[in-house]
Amino acid sequence: MRVMVMVKATKDSEEGIHPEKEEFQKLLADMGKFNEELVKAGVLLAADGLKPSSKGKRVRFSSTERTVIDGPFSETKELVAGFWLWQVKSMEEAIEWVKRCPCPFPGVESEIEIRPLAEPEDFGEALAPEFKEYEERLRVQAAAGN
């Protein structure tokens, strides 16, 4: 199963504030080692950190209208500061990996959320076979860089 693992933003991460230099370098080294473990285990599919929401945009959909909303966005607890995309055998395996993760924001309470990705089989018979084949072709093309 594939899961998205999201590091929730904090007030400091939203303000672009990093820990002191020494502590930040240790965090980066620890995260690097953790990511290496994920790669060696065949779990890591993708990972990245995100800039604060002040650098982002949202597009609100209302019928046929699209409205662009400039960041920053006020609800810090709903914002994501970074993510991993993992291939794991179960939610329990994902939880065990997250428990091994270095604290993403040393010195403050932080949270990591794990969400399974919706896979074609989750839609059952509602997903036409030709759409499933189409999805698979797109995934292969994307992986090949086309």
Model segments located where?
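Conserved, structured core segments of small domains
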Residues: 1-146
